[in-house]
Structure formats: C-alpha cells, structure tokens
Swiss-Prot record:
Its main location: membrane. This is Cell division protein FtsL. It comes from Salmonella typhimurium (strain LT2 / SGSC1412 / ATCC 700720). Residues 58-121 are periplasmic. Keywords: Cell cycle, Cell division, Cell inner membrane, Cell membrane, Membrane, Transmembrane, Transmembrane helix. The keyword Aminoacyl-tRNA synthetase does not apply.
C-alpha cells in the first residue's frame, strides 16, 4: 500500500516538474485499471443486480395485474356457466316440454292400443 502511494506521489512530482499535460479521464481510467479492479468489478455487479431487481419487480407487477384480470374473467365465465346450467334445466323440464308439445304442436298422448310397432329388417 505504501509503495502504491509512493509511486503515485512520484508520478505527481514528475508531472509537476514537466510541462506535460494529462487528460483527466485518461488518468482516472488508468488509476481504476491499476488500483481499482476489485471496486470496479463490485460496482458493475451492483449495477447489474439493481437492474435485475428492477426488471424482476416490473415483470412481477405485470404478471400480478394479468393474474387479477384472469381471475375476474374466470369469475365471469363461472357465473355464465351457472346461468346456462339453470337455463338448460328450465328448458329441459318435462312439464314444459309436454306443455309446448300439446299447445304449439297439437300433439297428444298415444293410447297403447293405437300404437304401431315397425320392425325393420
């Protein structure tokens, strides 16, 4: 650690004595690559983790909203199915069918003595 500081100070003293100009981004990048590899890697990992957390939270919210909509649709279909069952039972009621047959179609009960049985060969 002390050698690093000494090296950095000697560079600074050397650059002060000379008229050489250094670009600040280049100095920062050089310093990061030389002495800050671990913090730089950790910083990149933190940024990637944060982006992943935000993306996951967004997808979770979308899926939760979609699930709620599907639950509402399922409930509506369940109500419609129950109404259709009731309608089927009402329309298939024997007394209703018999009443329609006698009133609208003028059908009558057949006397067993008037029945004809047809046998097909």
């Amino acid at each position: 650690m002390i050698s690093r500081v000494t090296e950095a100070l000697s560079k600074v003293k050397g650059s002060i004595g000379s008229n050489e100009r250094h670009a600040l981004p280049g100095v920062i990048g050089d310093d990061l690559l030389r002495f800050g590899k671990l913090p730089l890697c950790l910083f990149i990992c933190i940024i990637l983790t944060a982006v992943t957390v935000v993306t996951t939270a967004h997808h979770t919210r979308l899926l939760t909203a979609q699930r709620e909509q599907l639950v509402l649709e399922r409930d509506a279909l369940d109500i419609e199915w129950r109404n259709l069952i009731l309608e089927e039972n009402a329309l298939g009621d024997h007394s209703r069918v018999e009443r329609i047959a006698t009133e609208k179609l003028q059908m009558q009960h057949v006397d067993p003595s008037q029945e004809n049985i047809v046998v097909q060969k």
